[in-house]
Amino acid sequence: MDVRRAQEIASSPVMANVTYNGQRIYIEHVDQQKGVATIHPLDNPNQKQSVPVASLEEHS
């Protein structure tokens, strides 16, 4: 995924189907300069982590 699309998803009120390492996640914040996103698994909001945006996959 590119940084621009990750930012669009993070800003959208519509929930997108995005995964990180096969697990569905929620994008909390995108740092466009560093190319990283703060995410958490849908089933565990307390498990926040920063990951490269390129490692996120959007599914339709």
Swiss-Prot record:
Classify the main location: other
Q: Could you tell me where this protein is found in the cell? A: Spore core
Q: Which InterPro entries match?
A: SASP_SspH
Matching entries from Pfam families are given as: SspH
Provide a GO CC annotation, any one: endospore-forming forespore
Q: Name one GO biological process term.
A: asexual sporulation
**Induction pattern:** Expressed only in the forespore compartment of sporulating cells.
Q: Which domain of life is it from?
A: Bacteria
Region of interest (Disordered), residue spans = 39-60
Which keywords has UniProt assigned to this entry? Answer: Sporulation
Q: Into which family does the record put it? A: Belongs to the SspH family.
Instruction: Supply the name of the protein.
Output: Small, acid-soluble spore protein H 1
